[in-house]
Amino acid sequence: MKSNTESLAWENLRYDLHSWIKEAISSMGYPTMTPVQASTIPLLSGNKDVVVEAVTGSGKTLSFVIPVLQKISDRLYKPDSDGDLPEPVKRGHMLSIVLSPTRELANQIQSVFNQVLQYLPEDKGTRINTQLLVGSIGNVREDLNQFLTNQPQILIGTPGRILEFLGSSQSIKTSSLEIVILDEADKLLDFSFEKDVINILKKLPKQRRTGLFSATISSAGNTIFRTGMNNPVKVQVKSKNYFGEQSNSPKSLQLSYMMINPELKITTLLTILSKYQYKKAIVYFPTCTSVKHFYQIFNKVYQQESSDEPLKFFSLHGQLNTKSRLKTLDNFTQGDINLYKHILMTTDVAARGIDIPDVDLVIQIDPPTDPNVFLHRCGRTGRANKVGRAIVMLNDNCQEEDYIGFMEVKGIFLTKQDIPTSSATKNLHENFQIKLRQYMLEDRARHELAVKSYVGFIRYYSKHIASSIFRLATLDYLGIAKMYGLLRLPKMPETKYIDNSIMPTDGWLGEIIDMDKYSYADKLQEKTRLENLENDKLKKIQDAKRRKELKIKNEAWSSKSERKENKLDRKEKLKRKREAIEKQIMEEERLNDGGNKDEEDEVVEDWKDMVRKNKKKQKKNNSIQGSFDDL
């Protein structure tokens, strides 16, 4: 009976590869196939569409690189039955497209193709070329000129740029295309890329081979049937964990978790990075701003013990331009591990497919919002049967420990790991917090970045798919604020979840500082701040003056209105009084009807005197009122 190693020898592959490809594989140091390669290469090299789901680090990239090169070699070099060589590929035509969700992964895939193509014999005549098509590197016009000049048979890139490229000129023809590959297919078929990917596939001939590859392809669901595959064969390769349970992670990868107070996360991370034995590590942060924030802190605040092996930090995130990202990734990959321990601080931009040698350790400061990404992050280590370690930090005193059971349902098993509790770790935390506060006080811009990172994390947390576990109502807002180095809590709706008994006065997390005197280190920025501060003060004074004037104006209008109302009341009273007197006189006349005329004349005269007195009194009142009006 053959051993497993013997059965996976390349000579036992159930498909006859071109001799130059066999030589390339041998020269590159791959004595045996991986299970996914042994299953996939014969199918895809033949006439089968495939959907491949295999654990991270299982050799999926070579599983499609070899079939693509095999098919192109057949098209370019394989004689027909009469011994005649095939016709050259027409100008403007391509034979294969490989799609990737990120620029970094596309760049890496091209590197693998080019490594194999180094072994293509010179006497083959027509060379097999590749071209990288990703955003932020050159423009589509430059891509088109390069394509028409070099005539590459293989296009590798991100969906947006490839779709733009295919529609940029009538000189580009897809009718000769033979095979298309979707690497990290579950990501390419989610809402962020699906439209572009489907539009690309519509431009390609229906009689083609299609390969979908991912560690979590099952999450793509029924979307895979929109890719135009014909009776695809599903290749699924899983491993068993140390307990013999079926697992979606490689056996060589040790997965563990820590329950930790968020305030202690950063100093615990630094302790692990200083004390653990590894060559290269990748640390995943939730947002781009948090990567920038902690990258600055680690380089300016953290001081290692002289006995520890020196650390070198690298920053990689989506807000960097493509050239900077590729340069950082190259520096991290090519760095001398004999001089430093290399630590890449990154986001999910480096979570999928990227194969970096010597990565022994992966740490996640927080779990990803999408549980499927968890395995992709961890899979940057423990690749190709090499031992790797992955740790995820979960916030204590809330429901996050339920995440472990949630991941077990998905076939991912984690063991609990204790946090470092030595006196040295406690001293590190105390000293680090003092230095972190001083670092923040030196430059207002640093605190603004810290606040931006904190707010970004809260938004990130609120978008978690497992919302029943990651709940805003149970989050330790104060502990996280201290972790990010905040001096004061920002005003945001989520602070309503903080219990009033622990809510700091006016949001201050330490000694109160005068924000008007809290300055920027940058002189130009500080000058602008002071000018804005002065303008704000003037505006406040002007606003107060306007409010006072408006108040006086409103009061004057109110008094005038009141006087008018009083005058009308007096007139009404006088009218009623006059009517009452007239009524009384008429009543007396009626009773004394027939009396002597002298009495009547006397009554009339008395009435006239009364009217004159009333008029004089009214005139006097008006005169007095007028004098008050002049005041």
UniProtKB/Swiss-Prot annotation:
Q: Which GO terms describe its biological process?
A: assembly of large subunit precursor of preribosome; maturation of LSU-rRNA
Tell me which Gene3D superfamilies the record gives.
P-loop containing nucleotide triphosphate hydrolases
- Coiled coil stretches, renumbered: 525-594
| Keywords from the named record | ATP-binding, Coiled coil, Helicase, Hydrolase, Nucleotide-binding, Nucleus, Ribosome biogenesis, RNA-binding, rRNA processing
Q: Where does ATP bind?
A: 54-61
Q: Where is this motif: DEAD box?
A: 183-186
What PROSITE patterns does the record tag this protein with? DEAD_ATP_HELICASE (PS00039), HELICASE_ATP_BIND_1 (PS51192), HELICASE_CTER (PS51194), Q_MOTIF (PS51195)
SUPFAM superfamilies annotated for this entry?
P-loop containing nucleoside triphosphate hydrolases
Q: Report the EC code(s) recorded for this entry.
A: 3.6.4.13
Transmembrane stretches, by residue range?
A: none
Q: Where in the cell is it found?
A: Nucleus, Nucleolus
Family membership noted in the UniProt record: Belongs to the DEAD box helicase family. DDX55/SPB4 subfamily.
Q: What is this protein called?
A: ATP-dependent rRNA helicase SPB4
Gene name, Swiss-Prot/TrEMBL: SPB4
